[in-house]
Amino acid sequence: MTATNELLQDLKARGLIAQCTADEELAEHLSTDCRTLYCGFDPTADSLHIGSLVPLLVLKRFQQAGHKPLALVGGATGLIGDPSFKAAERQLNTSDVVGDWVNKIRAQVSAFVDFNESKNGAEVVNNLDWIGEINVIEFMRDIGKHFSVNSMIQKESVKQRIDREGSGISFTEFSYMLLQSYDFAALNKAKECTLQIGGSDQWGNITGGIDLTRRMNRNKVFGLTLPLVTKSDGTKFGKTESGTIWLDPSKTSPYAFFQFWLGTADADVYDFLRFFTFLSVDEIAAFEESDKSVQGRPAGQGVLAKEVTRLVHGEEGLASSERITAALFSGDLASLTETDLAQLAQDGLPTTELEASEQTIVEVLTQSELAKSNKMAREFIGNGAVSVNGEKVADAEVILKKEDALFGKYSVIKRGKKLFNLYIWK
């Protein structure tokens, strides 16, 4: 399968391979047939966040090259929590909570791979289906006997926790490696799965699964890890001042998602294009070269925001994000739909809720903190710096009414070029 050779070369060119077991053997293994691979996603919240995008898209890349992807949702391992490189033990959640999260994450994963009836059609599996059937005696006898505690505590992910003063690691979390390792052995036996992918922090768990599969099934399997995405300024990827960037549009709106990528630093944008899009490496290199000579804002951020928003939220989500962005810039707020404004109310703009049916513009400016005092509010109005729903306000005595609001609910207040507040009439 020449597509596989091209895939591995492409992954390397994109910087998407951190570690790989027996890379030449893996290349040969993948080139001879349609192979089954998997990646695990533990339900630690009711949605995946953008940190999960790299492995999701790599599953998709393998499927495009002719291989069968399995997305494992950790209904069992999610009840325990992966200790890998964590400073402290995770809070344990109830089976009902984790079960609900599993269903939501299963639906999210399904948007990224093709569940057709062909040989390489994707599947979503839940490790509770096989781990939940094991009793304690079977676990200790059939799985635990294959693991050396000496080697387990030498794995860097565990060693850091043991060595950290005041931390330590519980037996519950220490056992996580055995459960994840058993996932690989179980999928190898039931689905002929021969490759596990995951973040570079999963290397210890992946190699544990490779060893267990060899011991239990007498089969050779492989592991490949992906780099953990970092930002050039040292801040955590996927976090903003307002919190985590989620894939679920009810937690992070398509507009806020689009804006996150639009705000990518110049030093990161081309790496992110290689990681998070299906544009070819040559196309990305051309953007990078072209942007070197551009006066003003480079094109890379806009391309990145469009490509990733389309992947996650579809054409409709991208269209609404671009429509909102253009309307806020131009002041043509009449072009916005009620759904667009609901996105702004969710997480796109600072908001102020109003119970009354009318309010003076001066009161609106001070209540929304666009002006620190009535005097300043009047000065801003006098200088032509204030608009409501795209219309300049020239008179400080103007009264805003609910009946004049967009869709009877929203008034977008703008002061200057970039300061906004969304008034929500109750």
UniProtKB/Swiss-Prot annotation:
GO terms for biological process: tyrosyl-tRNA aminoacylation. One of its GO terms (molecular function) is ATP binding. A motif ('KMSKS' region) lies at residues 236-240. It holds the Pfam family SYY_C-terminal. Residues 359-426 form the S4 RNA-binding domain. A motif ('HIGH' region) lies at residues 43-52. Signal peptide: none annotated. GO terms for cellular component: cytosol. L-tyrosine binds at residues 38, 176, 180. Its EC number is 6.1.1.1. SUPFAM superfamilies: Alpha-L RNA-binding motif, Nucleotidylyl transferase. It is found in: Cytoplasm. It catalyses: tRNA(Tyr) + L-tyrosine + ATP = L-tyrosyl-tRNA(Tyr) + AMP + diphosphate + H(+). InterPro entries: aa-tRNA-synth_Ic (IPR002305), Rossmann-like_a/b/a_fold (IPR014729), S4_RNA-bd_sf (IPR036986), SYY-like_C (IPR054608), Tyr-tRNA-ligase (IPR002307), Tyr-tRNA-ligase_bac-type (IPR024088), Tyr-tRNA-ligase_bac_1 (IPR024107). Gene3D superfamilies: HUPs, RNA-binding S4 domain, Tyrosyl-Transfer RNA Synthetase. Keywords: Aminoacyl-tRNA synthetase, ATP-binding, Cytoplasm, Ligase, Nucleotide-binding, Protein biosynthesis, RNA-binding. ATP binds at residue 239. It comes from the Bacteria. Homodimer. Belongs to the class-I aminoacyl-tRNA synthetase family. TyrS type 1 subfamily. Catalyzes the attachment of tyrosine to tRNA(Tyr) in a two-step reaction: tyrosine is first activated by ATP to form Tyr-AMP and then transferred to the acceptor end of tRNA(Tyr). This is Tyrosine--tRNA ligase. The gene is tyrS.
